[in-house]
Amino acid sequence: MFTINILLLIIPILLAVAFLTLVERKVLGYMQLRKGPNIVGPYGLLQPIADAIKLFTKEPLQPSTSSTSMFIIAPIMALTLALTMWVPLPMPHPLINMNLGVLFMLAMSSLAVYSILWSGWASNSKYALIGALRAVAQTISYEVTLAIILLSVLLMNGSFTLSTLITTQEHLWLIFPSWPLTMMWFISTLAETNRAPFDLTEGESELVSGFNVEYAAGPFALFFMAEYTNIIMMNAFTTILFLGAFHNPYMPELYTVNFTIKTLLLTISFLWIRASYPRFRYDQLMHLLWKNFLPLTLALCMWHVSLPITMSSIPPQT
């Protein structure tokens, strides 16, 4: 039964990833006043399927000087970790209801750094290594603010369990009392998932395509899928944390519909940002985090610690 549950979670995610690639190409196309994919199937709807067949039937090449085992393990690990992060997300019921769901999410996103690092190192190419080092520095840096913002939200929530966030936001979405946190969280998720304007890892002008430059066919597709899985997961997480979806125990379907619409809107905003903004310079990226976000999040964290005490109430213990 548990295996069926896992499959029922993974298969829709992979389908969503496949069609997100199509949505992205369509949205970017229309924003640049062109059509986007429109040949394969009606309105280009079968394009992701054609892409998948092409990628997975090609011969997976690898450089003769690369470290074989690590070269193969890295993309598999990237996708596995990306899918594992969906386990504690309440939609409205999580696959496994963890007491420390948030901590699990943080741990998994930290582990995802290793797959990027290994892929860059195992490729035995300067471009790949520089891309990987950039990605790791960026991910680790932005995780600091993500963790502090999460802590601030959880202080209002009163528990590390993600399911209680639904109860906390029954009357008021957390985006309203903590909108500065939400803004910083959203920008940090962009940086965490290596999306434009923070896609320095794949700076085409200087690094060809970043850490996955030596990958082709199947393994490349796995990295690609991991990236998009992470994008959808981060937006789902943002929805749970700040845009508490409407939950009625008698009609749990309403929650899922509400949750999906909000996640979709956030994902489209990711694409909109990609179409609108140029890439940051590396020092600007680090300056934004260490000089702007970090002091502000620390101050807001202290504010959230003192808030329940000043209002002479303790956080709800669930």
Curated annotation (Swiss-Prot):
Give me the segments passing through the membrane. 2-22, 70-90, 100-120, 146-166, 171-191, 222-242, 253-273, 294-314
Q: Name one GO biological process term.
A: aerobic respiration
EC number(s) stated in the UniProt entry for this protein: 7.1.1.2
Mention any Pfam family matching this sequence.
NADHdh
Disulfide bonds, paired cysteine numbers: none
Keywords, comma-separated and alphabetical: Electron transport, Membrane, Mitochondrion, Mitochondrion inner membrane, NAD, Respiratory chain, Translocase, Transmembrane, Transmembrane helix, Transport, Ubiquinone
Cellular localization per UniProt: Mitochondrion inner membrane
Q: Which InterPro entries match?
A: NADH_UbQ_OxRdtase_su1/FPO (IPR001694), NADH_UbQ_OxRdtase_su1_CS (IPR018086)
Instruction: Name the source's superkingdom.
Output: Eukaryota
Q: Which HAMAP family match?
A: NDH1_NuoH
Q: What is this protein called?
A: NADH-ubiquinone oxidoreductase chain 1
